[in-house]
């Protein structure tokens, strides 16, 4: 949740950390993510967050078999994480990828911005939980996460970032 909070609150700095004349021209093109900073979590992780937010049980997602049209090959299960290459910030199974940066650019600036923003989010979480009695900690953490999801879920987008509909939706969400 700290990463989602950090990206939401510091999206402008994340964007600036990847800025160059060539990269600004590239962003939003067919081979690059759009310039609107959003996070792709995938269906499964998004469903987990929705379950937490709504205090509902999360049942493991059903595995979907890919139909590749060849019956002599083994069956493949669809990956529940990132297949969306239109997202500038994507969860890819066990990590987040920041994809706005050009291939020849240094990752130093984006790393400093992201690490500092996540550290700030974690510090704010700590401050909020500081002094909570041990027997109340689990409930306090649960409520903190629910509030954070509600406040920062606007930055989560699992769709196609190249569409005009996304630009309009991002504008409604205050991301653009």
Specify the residue positions occupied by each region the protein language model found.
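Hydrophobic, small-residue-rich alpha-helical packing segments that form membrane-like cores
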Residues: 1-8
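Acidic, glycine-enriched catalytic cores built around paired aspartates
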Residues: 9-176
